[in-house]
Structure formats: C-alpha cells, structure tokens
C-alpha cells in the first residue's frame, strides 16, 4: 500500500522519484524500518537512478518526538534546503541485512554533513 501511494503521489505531482535526492524516513530502529526502507528503495531507486538515494531520520538527532514526528521531519528538510546541508545521522554503524538497498548501495545513510539541494 505504501508503494502504491508514493508512486501515485509522485506521478500526480509530475515528479520522477528517481530525481529526488533525499528522503526523510521514520527510522525508529524498529521492525517497521525494514518495510519502509524497502518500499522507498522500490519507488525512488528504479533503473534510471544514477546516484544513491540519501536517507535520514530526525530520531537520531533528537529522539522520537512522538505525535510531532512528521512536523519535525518536515522542519529538518526545510532547514536543510535553506542551508544547503543535510545533518548527519548519529549512531549508524552498519546496514540492516534485511534492507537490500542499503547493502547494494542504492540507499545511503548520511553519516557526515552532506551538502546538497543546490
């Protein structure tokens, strides 16, 4: 269902998901991370993508803000766009073996400040 929703939203907006440089994930370190990341890999990392999709989560920077999680993620992305820099994810050390996109390099967790959104 997530995959269909994302695909339809980007199609309706006229945006090719393969051109999106960064996606903010929920990333709570729970079982839900695997299906979320695998769905994002399928939608955003098609055969036409030439660079890894950069991913991150506000939770590594500030903990889980519970009901405000979506708003905090949106604020992080807006500030990153304004400052042309995505903050790194803390405490990431190795890829989840159940997320092929991390293992094969289609997804890349930002672990150093990343300059983008130019």
Mark where each language-model region is.
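Condensing-enzyme catalytic core of the thiolase-fold
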Residues: 1-118
């Amino acid at each position: 269902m997530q995959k269909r929703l994302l695909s339809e939203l980007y199609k309706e907006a006229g945006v090719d998901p393969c051109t999106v440089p960064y996606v903010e994930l929920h990333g709570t370190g729970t079982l839900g991370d695997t299906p979320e990341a695998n769905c994002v890999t399928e939608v955003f990392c098609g055969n036409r993508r030439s660079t890894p999709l950069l991913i991150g989560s506000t939770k590594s920077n500030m903990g889980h803000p519970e009901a405000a999680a979506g708003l905090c993620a949106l604020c992080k992305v807006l500030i990153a766009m304004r400052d042309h820099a995505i903050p790194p994810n803390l405490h990431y050390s190795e890829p989840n073996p159940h997320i092929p996109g991390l293992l094969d390099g289609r997804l890349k967790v930002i672990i150093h400040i990343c300059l983008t959104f130019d």
